[in-house]
Amino acid sequence: MGNSDSLKAVWFRRDFRLHDHTALKHAIEAIEKHGGKWLAFFYLDPKTASVEPVHHDYFFQTVMQFKQMLKTNGGDLYIITGTIEGALSKLLQAFPEIDAVYANDDRVGDGRLRDEAAEHFLAKQSIPFYTFEDAYLTEPDQVLKKDGTPYKVFTPYYKAWAKERKRTPAVIKRDVLLGSVHKGTAPDREAETLFNNLIKKCSYDWSAIGEEHAIKRLQMFTKKRLSGYKANRDFPSITGTSRLSPYIKTGAVSSRSIYYHILNAEADSYSAETFLKELAWRDFYRMVHFYEPDCKDREIMEGYRELNWSHDQDDLTSWKRGETGFPIVDAGMRQLLNEGWMHNRLRMITASFLTKDLLIDWRLGERYFERMLIDYDPSSNIGGWQWAASVGTDAVPYFRIFNPVTQSKRFDENGTYIRTYIPELNHVPDHYIHEPWKMSEEEQVKYKCRLDEDYPLPIVDHSKQRKKALSFFKGDDEE
């Protein structure tokens, strides 16, 4: 017999949507069978609230947009904070009718520890805590080698991943969803105030956020850009990528919805496969993170754990500010500063420059990207940095060192991208745009760009640094 007074509490984390939401689907199905209502809540970790990276601006604005959307539909997103035990206790005190908590799981990093603590606390209250795999297309321990061990190389992983049947999007009955949403009094006024203050302190303002915009962008990309994705995705001056990553980060759209939307699209099959392979890379790096839980702080390749990386603050600051004297590197870093996002080709170029040209510790780069990227995904970011630094799983060989000038000429031939983010070089002609240091003094005056005044000279000599990097990784550097 059903209990019409019971409440199902759905814990939203990085899944701010009402469609294709696995935990929400199960909560609604329970309500259909047994009656009751559901409420939504968000746990604001005090550690998260105490720092103000750019990606938090985007994330918290998404949370606020979702909260407002729920209010429009008769509900609310309740904010709780404090220790996880204390926060959940407040929630249960405010809503004693709660008889189950539902969430999409977090199986890596701090989220894993938080969920273990939450499960332990709720068990003491005799309240079941149901968690579901949702954020990825495959579970981290699903695609393994025949001997049950994780893959170390992406290509064979991808072949196995491609054969795996992917979960289809979760269908949620909209009438039941909106008809059973609960509206009550906020359980934690302190948390609501803390959250509102975080919103007020946001230094960046994003308008195209949330579920509705995510779906529109997916549809637009599929219709207008997918067919040219394979050919255009590496050129930053072309709008050739999906720009879906911030929406994936916040869960405004699910990877399942994207996967099946692309799979069923009438587009070039090679471009579609190339795009889907990026989703496989996301699953791959999450799998690596699952089996290498210390990879944020430690190289996966044991042979490189004792490298004597540089921590030169002047070089690091030049890199962060986009003042290295290498236009393609600086354009990428300035895009990151201005937009909280960077084209993927530039992520590789800038990471290679930091670790191979400056020989600066990859962890410093990873931490900076963590602070700045609005699409920051721990597993993918760590994996990408260890790849660039040649110290991770299936990493680029240490002797493959990106030449920033060659990369610039190949992927931004006419300097369109460079000029977008480095106005000092607007008048510099194409034949100097990649190497402005080759201009004579007369040409610098003519093109309104005086080196070391308007735009910096290169902070390193790439050819010399390449030789130094090779020695560094071989272990025969003298420093």
Curated annotation (Swiss-Prot):
Binds 1 FAD per subunit. Binds 1 5,10-methenyltetrahydrofolate (MTHF) non-covalently per subunit. Residues 278-285, 344-345 are annotated as: Interaction with DNA. Keywords: Chromophore, DNA damage, DNA repair, DNA-binding, FAD, Flavoprotein, Lyase. FAD binds at residues 229, 241-245, 278-285, 375-377. GO terms for molecular function: deoxyribodipyrimidine photo-lyase activity; DNA binding; FAD binding. It is an enzyme of class 4 (lyase). Signal peptide: none annotated. It comes from the Bacteria. Its EC number is 4.1.99.3. DNA binds at R233, Q407. Residues 6-137 form the Photolyase/cryptochrome alpha/beta domain. Its cofactor is FAD; (6R)-5,10-methylene-5,6,7,8-tetrahydrofolate. It catalyses: cyclobutadipyrimidine (in DNA) = 2 pyrimidine residues (in DNA). GO terms for biological process: DNA repair; response to light stimulus. Pfam families: DNA_photolyase (PF00875), FAD_binding_7 (PF03441). The record marks W309, W362, W385 as: Electron transfer via tryptophanyl radical. Monomer. Involved in repair of UV radiation-induced DNA damage. Catalyzes the light-dependent monomerization (300-600 nm) of cyclobutyl pyrimidine dimers (in cis-syn configuration), which are formed between adjacent bases on the same DNA strand upon exposure to ultraviolet radiation. Belongs to the DNA photolyase class-1 family. This is Deoxyribodipyrimidine photo-lyase. It comes from Alkalihalophilus pseudofirmus (strain ATCC BAA-2126 / JCM 17055 / OF4) (Bacillus pseudofirmus).
